[in-house]
Curated annotation (Swiss-Prot):
CDD domains: EPSP_synthase. It comes from Legionella pneumophila (strain Corby). This is 3-phosphoshikimate 1-carboxyvinyltransferase. Monomer. Belongs to the EPSP synthase family. InterPro entries: Enolpyruvate_Tfrase_dom, Enolpyruvate_Tfrase_sf, EPSP_synthase, EPSP_synthase_CS, RNA3'P_cycl/enolpyr_Trfase_a/b. SUPFAM superfamilies: EPT/RTPC-like (SSF55205). GO terms for biological process: amino acid biosynthetic process; aromatic amino acid family biosynthetic process; chorismate biosynthetic process. The lineage of its organism: Bacteria, Pseudomonadati, Pseudomonadota, Gammaproteobacteria, Legionellales. Keywords: Amino-acid biosynthesis, Aromatic amino acid biosynthesis, Cytoplasm, Transferase. The active site is at D315. Catalyzes the transfer of the enolpyruvyl moiety of phosphoenolpyruvate (PEP) to the 5-hydroxyl of shikimate-3-phosphate (S3P) to produce enolpyruvyl shikimate-3-phosphate and inorganic phosphate.
Length: 433
């Protein structure tokens, strides 16, 4: 078992980049694989989750070179060129891989099966299997959870699906199926979710219409190979944004971070809490906005986090809770029940961990209350969740004594270089088994 010890620091200084965006990396493989021609992807995240997606397409006959120095070259086979995988597709810890692949595979002529690790096998899949079945797909789950069995050769028909809650994975799953369906597939969103798939469709020259929260796609299009530069992942940058905000005397710069407006909840929430975050040198990598982030220490205050921020910061809440633990006053969050359905029950994991470190935190069914103060040293269990592990590693920097975090191996799913990157900024994090 891999564990971390994170020791208190004086302050954080320096300049870093973070690995390529995980959401965009997954999608670059998917669309590159079904494109006509070759795609060259730079900035690819070679974490275990994205490698699971890459290997899935290799098993379906797609030639993919790399990753080599974050570059991947994909020799696309076109929309109808995938071959039946010889084995069950193992998505590892990656819900994104499973849900997006399910949409694509539901439209193929061959049968397939998707499985994953112990954590993924507990995650809800009816949210994709039901609308796919409405389209005519034959998708079977095990009591609503993986593994997923998909019978190929089914004729799909477009549907108008009103999203019951914000979910980029469900939306993307249905858009991928809609690329093969008879007629139009329309998806109506009542709350904003990540729009990387829609941007990626444009990058690969596939026609998609977006107006007033309605996305429309049909099968009358092809993806075409392209060159793509992937920005740094704001979900990975979030750990250091919070760290610099709560560690007195800190002053750091994070270069080349994706600032897609469906992902910047972390910046809005921390700014509302009083953080000193400057967004510099704004530009674009293709369809995706990018900037450099300059963060300096500032005393934070507790806030009631608006429900509208939940889908814009869903993956960043564990480390936002660390910021709340260091803020003056109370921070509350509601409307975030989805956090209980992630790689772990993130509300439960954070409440337990914060209480272990002397911070008063209470969990609700859909959120949390945290009374800010000071973080003590101690030992917490990440429950095998990469974001919980990294969040408590950040807490160690400002704790009164070292924080030991157990069960950290899954950090490799999203941020394999986390410890190395952190220590550039003068963290004191050690790994041990």
């Amino acid at each position: 078992m891999l564990n971390f010890i994170s020791k208190p620091v004086v302050c954080l200084k320096g300049e870093i980049t973070v690995p390529g965006d995980k959401s965009i990396s997954h999608r670059s493989i998917i669309f590159g694989a079904i494109a006509i021609g070759t795609s060259v992807i730079d900035g690819f995240l070679d974490g275990e989750d994205c490698i699971a997606t890459l290997k899935a397409f290799q098993s379906m006959g797609v030639r993919i070179e790399g990753p080599d120095k974050q570059r991947v070259i994909i020799h696309g086979v076109g929309k109808y060129g995938l071959k039946q995988p010889q084995n069950i597709i193992d998505c590892g810890n990656s819900g994104t891989s499973m849900r997006l692949l399910a949409g694509l595979l539901a439209a193929q002529q061959f049968d397939s099966q998707l499985t994953g690790d112990e954590s993924l096998l507990k995650r809800p899949m009816l949210r994709i299997s039901r609308p796919l079945s409405q389209m005519g797909a034959d998708v079977t789950t095990q009591d609503g959870k993986p593994p997923i069995l998909i019978k190929g050769g089914k004729k799909l028909n477009g549907i108008h699906y009103v999203m019951p809650e914000a979910s980029a994975q469900v939306k993307s799953c249905l858009l991928l199926a809609g690329m093969y369906a008879e007629g139009q597939t329309k998806i109506t969103e009542n709350a904003v979710s990540r729009d990387h798939t829609e941007r990626m469709l444009r990058t690969f020259s596939y026609p998609v219409q977006i107006q007033d929260g309605v996305i429309v796609i049909d099968r009358n299009g092809e993806c075409h190979g392209t060159r793509l530069n992937i920005p740094g992942d704001i979900s990975s940058a979030a750990f250091f944004i919070v760290a610099a905000s709560i560690t007195p005397g800190s002053d750091i710069l994070i270069r080349n971070v994706g600032i897609n407006p469906t992902r910047t909840g972390i910046i809005h929430i921390l700014t509302e809490m009083g953080a000193d975050i400057k967004v510099l040198n704004q530009r674009a990598y293709g369809e995706e906005p990018v900037a450099d982030l300059h963060i300096r220490y500032s005393q934070l205050k507790g806030i009631d986090i608006p429900v509208s921020m939940v889908p814009l910061a869903i993956d960043e809440f564990p480390v936002i809770f660390i910021a709340a633990a260091c803020a003056q006053g109370k921070t509350t969050l509601h409307g975030a029940k989805e956090l209980r359905l992630k790689e772990s029950d993130r509300i439960g994991a954070m409440v337990d961990g914060l209480n272990q470190l002397g911070v008063h935190a209470e969990g609700f069914d859909d959120g949390i209350l945290i009374e800010g103060g000071s973080i003590q040293g101690g030992e917490v269990n990440s429950r095998g969740d990469h974001r919980i592990a990294m969040s408590f590693a950040i807490a160690g920097a400002v704790a009164s004594a070292p924080v030991t975090i157990k069960n950290c191996a899954n950090v490799a799913t999203s941020f394999p270089s986390f410890v190395t990157t952190a220590n550039i900024l003068h963290f004191q994090i050690e790994e041990y088994s």
